[in-house]
Amino acid sequence: PMLLFFIISGWLIFTWTKKIYGSRAGLLALFLFSLTPTIIAHSRLVNTDMAALFGVILSTYFFVRYLKDQTKKNFWLAAITFGIAELTKFSTFLLIPYFVLVGIIWGYAYHHHIRSMLLGAWKSILVVVVGFIFIVGPVYQLHLLGYSAEKQQADAKIILGTYGNRLFADPVIW
């Protein structure tokens, strides 16, 4: 299945680039994507990197589509794909500052004033919050069914006890 994520990611890159710049640019983007050393190394492995890549590309596509055409449908597609991307790998939390930054730049690039930049940031934050509430939250709640608060606390203490930097581990209060 991870190879499938690689193939679909390549198709998304080709299609998105072709839509904006034409077929030749789409083929060039696909060529560069396919021959990137990181992609070559990870596309054949069974880990979450390719799924995360797919989630990041898909959510970025729908987020940019929402910024271009701010309809309810595009908002929900951006929020849902963001939530799904967040579920693929922990490091995809970096989509949060990325989306806020893209929203700010988008607001400035098209309107050239602070109000539009703040509005772009607000829309980005709204996509993130809705994605967490409707996608990430329910999935994590399913994992917590039957996991008592006492067991959660005991497990957290064990994990925090092994954490090397006490500056961050000690302030956790139960």
What are the language-model segments listed below?
Residues 44-51:
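Short acidic/glycine- and proline-prone juxtamembrane loop motifs at membrane-interface regions
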Residues 62-71, 82, 95-132:
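Perimembrane helix-loop-helix junctions
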Residues 136-174:
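Aromatic-rich transmembrane-lumenal/periplasmic boundary elements in polytopic membrane proteins
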Residues 12, 51-68, 81-82:
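Specific aromatic-rich, kink-prone transmembrane helix
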Residues 3-20, 58-62:
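Transmembrane-helix motifs of polytopic, lipid-linked glycan transferases
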Residues 21-27, 70-77:
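Membrane-helix interface segments
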Residues 29-34, 41, 61, 82, ...:
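Short helix- or helix-capping micro-motifs
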